[in-house]
């Protein structure tokens, strides 16, 4: 009986994974991204998949949100900062993808984790996400907290710099969306690619 339940669970995960991957690929293909610049990782990392991701941060309401809150549903996680136009556009595209998934009766939790916790406090995240999608969960914490969770996901990012030409701060980082299973384990990651006007 237990073996049968495990097999059914794996089948459901496989189907959901295939549907989500297909929808994300098609959405990016027909949106403002060049098809040749869209990268879909087709391999699930055995190392990452062998153990659940562990972290503890604070959401936009100031409440603790940890790895246990990822369990019970699929999650899409994106790392970025509130002052980046590229990140804002990425979140809006994720929002569009979620709407498509909802039409297929696939419920996915969306999580935005800041890479600049000094600037992006819970209050800043709350105001920022209200203008994008109230369903997004925004997470922040101490510098050590963010470093730890970024390392868990192997996120590449550089220290914040000031752009004298634009008069704005920028923080360069990898542009991946991470899909987490309903038991809190890494399943897959997708790169959103580069917009046509950024080539």
Curated annotation (Swiss-Prot):
Disulfide bonds: none
Gene3D superfamilies (alphabetical): Glutaredoxin
Pfam family name, one: SCO1-SenC
CDD domains: SCO
InterPro entries reported for this sequence: SCO1/SenC (IPR003782), Thioredoxin-like_sf (IPR036249)
SUPFAM superfamilies per the UniProt record, alphabetical: Thioredoxin-like
Similarity comment text for this entry: Belongs to the SCO1/2 family.
Protein name: SCO2-like protein RBE_0029
Species of origin: Rickettsia bellii (strain RML369-C)
